[in-house]
Regions:
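N-terminal leader/targeting segments and the immediate start of mature chains
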Residues: 15, 19-57, 217-219, 224-239
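An acidic-aromatic
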Residues: 52-106
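Amphipathic hydrophobic-ligand
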Residues: 42-49, 71-73, 168-173
Length: 239
């Protein structure tokens, strides 16, 4: 898969774009996005539209820039199709899908931010400066891989997510800003995420700007039903 078309690969980088979106009668959700990924002093820019089908628990990402690409996300499988090159890849992940803003949509319709479904448990909570912080511990068998998750929310809106190792080292952090009302929920229209090396050195920085949110609006081109053409050979990749 071309490097300039990869979405950031980062375990547990972020969990939600919508706080308790399941409170609204969600059937479909579409968002335009512009994404910047900075790594090693180089910035890649990607733009397109993300579609979520709640009933099918399926995400379709249409990338329009820099090159055309269609990504299909369902369960622990991600399929990527390049229509111009007529190539396709299928990635199967053991744990969470390491695609920050795609994963956040998938988890948005689940209680407890989807953490309990993969074995996380609420350890404790605290309130500081009107922000509610909840601390989530991973299942024992996955502590070395997943790390502790700390979520911050204010007025029912998710504003931050952090991942720390068992010894307290910060490995990832996401901030949610510019919330807008959609149905019964507030959607952050800007999400920034950082991956860290040891000593808090930033390894990778990602900024995503969302626009034109559409709730329960059927996309005109039936993209939600898209399947990779049967004539295309799909290369299998285990992650």
């Amino acid at each position: 898969m071309p490097k300039n078309l990869q979405f950031s690969i980062a375990l547990l980088l972020t969990f939600l774009i919508v706080h308790a979106l399941h409170a609204a009668p969600l059937k479909t959700l579409s968002l335009d996005f512009k994404r910047e990924l900075t790594e090693n002093d180089k910035t890649e820019r990607t733009a397109g539209t993300l579609h979520y089908d709640a009933e099918a628990a399926r995400v379709i990402v249409e990338v329009t820039e820099p090159l055309k690409q269609i990504m299909i996300v369902k369960g622990k499988v991600v399929e990527i199709y390049y229509p111009v090159e007529n190539q396709a890849f299928r990635f199967t992940f053991e744990g969470r899908i390491p695609l920050p803003f795609v994963e956040s949509i998938l988890q948005s319709t689940q209680a407890e931010y989807g953490l309990t479904t993969i074995g996380y448990s609420l350890d404790r909570y605290e309130i500081a400066d009107d922000v509610l912080y909840t601390y989530w511990t991973p299942p024992e068998k996955a502590k070395d891989k997943l790390g502790t998750v700390i979520l911050g929310s204010r007025d029912g809106r998710l504003i931050s997510a952090e991942v720390k190792t068992s010894d307290g080292q910060l490995t990832a952090k996401s901030l949610y800003r510019n919330h807008t009302k959609l149905g019964n929920s507030h959607i952050p229209m800007e999400v920034t995420s950082s991956l860290y090396r040891r000593k808090s050195e930033v390894l990778e920085y990602e900024r995503v700007i969302y626009s034109n949110p559409q709730l329960n609006a059927q996309p005109p081109n039936s993209i939600l039903q898209f399947e990779i053409p049967k004539s295309v050979t799909i290369k299998e990749v285990k992650w």
